[in-house]
């Protein structure tokens, strides 16, 4: 019978991905080797997506700002009427085609994310071919307060732990952040015609039962993103006051990272245990925890049958 100090267990494996330097005239970062990088947009409407071409659920996504997001179907109907009455002027199309965010929450934003991505592709030429993440059937598991740059002026600013189906139909899991800000209020015909704006948009994701293993490398990559100082200055010069607040760009990314770390520390470990058991079942492991430290390890199948000590217990 194995003794506690000589048991055949090992720490949970983390992905053996290595990071490499990557840079453009807009930003630089450390990206996972072999992964694709897309960067597109203009000014504060800039998006970055870093993803594994073999499995697009494995990704880092960041966008500085998205607007407009309408407040109601009644508002959208009004804008569509203005669009028709003004001979389909492109100025009104921006609003006539906009996505309705019934609830100004981070959860509703990600529930509508596929629709929002399609809309942005259609109205912003510099993002016309940008491949937004596919987040079908987005479901919130947990939510945490964020430390995001726009939190103080936001209606909602959260980090969500959520699940989704990716573009391959595979189940994914990740951490998702945004801040939803009200642009203002202007009523006509009983509808508020103004809109919400989304800032601090960032997601890190992987396959559902692998996210716990990918989290660290994804966070390290996301946290390494640095915007070129000339790009930041030009965008600040072109922007308004709120834009300037959001545009301490590199500080915003640090705040996003801090938000993620805080959220991860606060998470419900029960989700991790369920994910790990599912993952282990296909790999022929069983999961045990150290009763003295609380750390979780992988052991060979049948370990708990062989082991009669008290220190290591099966994770249930």
Give each language-model segment a name:
Residues 2-20:
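N-terminal low-complexity, Pro/Thr/Ser-rich intrinsically disordered segments
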Residues 10-13, 52, 105, 205-207, ...:
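Alpha-helix initiation/capping motif
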Residues 14-19, 26, 155-157, 197:
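Sequence-level motif detector for i,i+2 pairs with an aromatic at +2
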Residues 17-30, 208-219:
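Short aromatic-glycine motifs in intrinsically disordered, low-complexity regions
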Residues 24-42, 221-228:
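Proline-anchored loop/turn motifs at beta-strand termini and strand-loop-strand connectors
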Residues 38-208, 234, 255, 262-316:
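Conserved polar/disulfide-associated segments of primarily extracytoplasmic proteins
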